[in-house]
Amino acid sequence: MKFGVLVFPGSNCDHDAYWTVQQVARQPVTFLWHEAHDLENCDAIIVPGGFAYGDYLRTGAIAKFSPVMASVKKFADAGGLVLGICNGFQILCEAGLLPGALMRNVGLKYICKPVQVRVETTDTPFTNACRQGEVLTIPIGHMEGNYFCDPSTLAELQRDSRIVFRYSAPDGRITPGANPNGSLDNIAGICSPGRNVLGMMPHPERAAEPELGGTDGFKVFQSLVGTMVAR
């Protein structure tokens, strides 16, 4: 099993993801530079958070043209596991691997704080170590986390159980007050039709060790490793 962590100019959570995979999950991992075409036989790809290309034009709008993203798309189309975190989620949407877009937060301010998200489905390679309806506490840190899509896409996401995480109150209720950024239907994370690509705004790598204040985020990595072992 081997993980690959993409590195774009402006990425700043790549080392956090690398550390979590190598030091916490105890799995082999390598960095993959944005100009690379070869994914080096990785079994799972992480598109990390940060500010790829300075977030110029739009978040992820330039990163989607990086050579490595063409390889990631082929990898995903073949069933490869891809996890996009924060800016990585934005990049996956821009690249067409996930539907919709991430817009400016409704308050037009950068938000950095722990939030609660409810696990809406465990039928993904990223959440099979969780319980249905489980509430996880995971930090966010973004300016453009306001997920939006057209009504037909939202209906499709709901119908196919592709909304993986939703912002919730600590008791699991989905309320407007639990929504930190105005995201449509309190969406915090969605998956692809094949369920092998996940984009999420919260940072699971920032909640993977007790020293960081919690380990709820590690369940995403635990799920991935378990899936890869079973394959």
Labelled PLM ranges:
Residues 50-51, 88, 143, 204:
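Active-site metal-binding loops of divalent metal-dependent hydrolases
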Residues 1-85, 93-99, 103-111, 118, ...:
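N-terminal beta1-alpha1 cap of cysteine-dependent amidohydrolase-like domains
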Residues 88-89, 123:
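Short, flexible active-site-adjacent loop segments at beta-strand->alpha-helix junctions, enriched
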Residues 73-77, 105-231:
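Amide-donor transfer/coupling interface in amidating biosynthetic enzymes
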Residues 52-53, 89-91, 146-147, 171:
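Glycine-rich nucleotide phosphate-binding loop and flanking beta-alpha elements
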